[in-house]
A protein has these predicted regions:
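Anionic-ligand binding patches
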Residues: 2-4, 10-28, 32-210
Length: 210
């Protein structure tokens, strides 16, 4: 069985592929780069994940499509960037260096927001909510979180998003310093995907003949 992921983000696709259960394959939704993106205007991760799953499922008739909404919640910033994590620098009108990537600008914007606060080790969490839909109907959801701290300088090159700043004290490493399999054992996305599959797979089993 193949489940289609409504993302073209290579980092997310790599995480999902590594977390897939036995007999469950994952693949990017065909043609997703050409599909107009929906407005992610819900105030919660759950709302945006459901919105996207329903929307993209209409582009894959009869197939199961998974969408995620995930981000970083920093306690010292009142939970920001939150659902705006991917657009944090844009929202703050922060440009950064001209050659910086979107991820790099978001990271620099976060550090600038924290630099005026006397919080030596800002606590934070990654949060992910996944929703699975087929033909416009939600089949299951799953959520996962992981707690950590925000460093003042980035470390590691294996991750994406805020991974170079997100420090796991129990590992003495940032998310960006972990290999894919180790990361999945701790990551919000790996935990959310496991919860989603636990809720979804029983629904897909053929009924037993009495």
């Amino acid at each position: 069985m193949t489940i289609y992921i409504a993302t073209s983000n290579p980092g997310k696709l790599r995480d999902f592929a590594a977390a897939a259960a036995q007999d469950v394959g994952v693949a990017p939704l065909p043609g997703i780069k050409e599909i107009p993106a929906p407005a992610e205007d819900e105030p919660t991760f759950d709302g945006n994940a459901r919105l996207k799953a329903i929307y993209y499922s209409h582009y894959a008739s009869g197939e199961i499509v998974i969408a995620d909404d995930s981000g970083l919640e920093v306690d010292a910033l009142g939970g920001a960037p939150g659902v705006r994590s991917a657009r944090y620098a844009e929202d703050k009108l922060f440009n950064g260096p001209s050659n910086a990537t979107i991820d790099e600008r978001n990271n620099l914007c976060l550090l600038e927001a924290l630099c005026t606060m006397s919080v030596p080790h800002p606590t934070a969490r990654y949060r992910c909510v996944l929703a699975a839909a087929r033909d416009g109907e939600i089949l299951a959801t799953g959520d996962g979180t992981v707690d950590g701290q925000i460093l003042s300088t980035p470390r590691g090159a294996k991750g994406f998003g805020y991974d170079p700043l997100f420090y796991l004290p129990q590992q003495n490493k940032t998310m960006a310093e972990l290999d894919v399999q180790t990361k999945l054992a701790f990551s919000h996305r790996g935990r959310a995907f496991a919860a989603l599959l636990k809720a979804l797979l029983p629904q897909l089993q053929p009924p037993q003949i009495q």
